């Protein structure tokens, strides 16, 4: 119900459901959210629910939302780094910047340091993945988002002041 209220509040502010996008990471917590969305009725949410496109040639069961793997996390981290370094994304949230300072390479992927949180970082990375997906259908985002076929520099640490 909270997600429906958030979507409704956004709709009241912009008066157009065509520009409201939402999704969940389809991990354990996201699966619970998907059950609630299904029971509440997706049609009762103002906006468009985004899901990762089904990959051809896989036998896995398709699930709504975005599946986060080490590879997808590395890719979105590279995209995020590019957006920050090219000043296409400005971070204004002090708690987010604080979490980014504790978001480190860990076992072939990225995660928060032991004892730290990364929920804001992972929410932002999900938002970046959603923006990349939306760009495929909205040409006006082409100049604001890096293209998939552009050479992406692998994620490296960067300092923010």
Task: Describe the residue ranges of each PLM region.
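Mg2+-dependent endonuclease catalytic cores in nucleic-acid-processing enzymes, primarily RNase H-like
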Residues: 1-109, 158-161
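Acidic two-metal-ion nuclease catalytic site recognized across multiple nuclease folds
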Residues: 127-161
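Intrinsically disordered, low-complexity regulatory regions of eukaryotic regulatory proteins
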Residues: 23, 116-117
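Short, glycine-/Ser/Thr-/acidic-enriched flexible segments
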Residues: 28-29, 96, 115, 128-131
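Helicase-core coupling region on the C-terminal RecA-like lobe
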Residues: 117-120, 139
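Long, compositionally biased intrinsically disordered regions
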Residues: 112-115, 137
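Amphipathic alpha-helical interaction/assembly segments
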Residues: 107-110, 120-130
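Acidic, Mg2+-coordinating catalytic modules of nucleic-acid enzymes
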Residues: 19, 113, 120
């Amino acid at each position: 119900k909270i997600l429906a209220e958030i979507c409704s509040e956004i709709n009241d502010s912009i008066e157009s459901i065509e520009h409201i996008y939402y999704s969940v990471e389809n991990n354990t917590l996201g699966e619970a959210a998907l059950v609630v969305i299904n029971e509440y009725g997706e049609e009762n949410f103002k906006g468009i629910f985004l899901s990762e496109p089904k990959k051809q040639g896989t036998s896995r069961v398709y699930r709504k939302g975005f599946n986060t793997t080490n590879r997808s996390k590395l890719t979105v981290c590279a995209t995020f780094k590019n957006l920050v370094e090219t000043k296409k994304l400005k971070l204004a949230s002090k708690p987010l910047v604080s979490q980014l300072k504790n978001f480190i390479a860990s076992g072939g992927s990225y995660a928060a340091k032991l004892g730290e949180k990364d929920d804001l970082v992972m929410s932002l990375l999900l938002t970046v993945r959603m923006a990349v997906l939306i760009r495929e259908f909205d040409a006006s985002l082409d100049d604001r988002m890096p293209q998939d076929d552009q050479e992406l520099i692998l994620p490296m640490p960067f300092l923010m002041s």
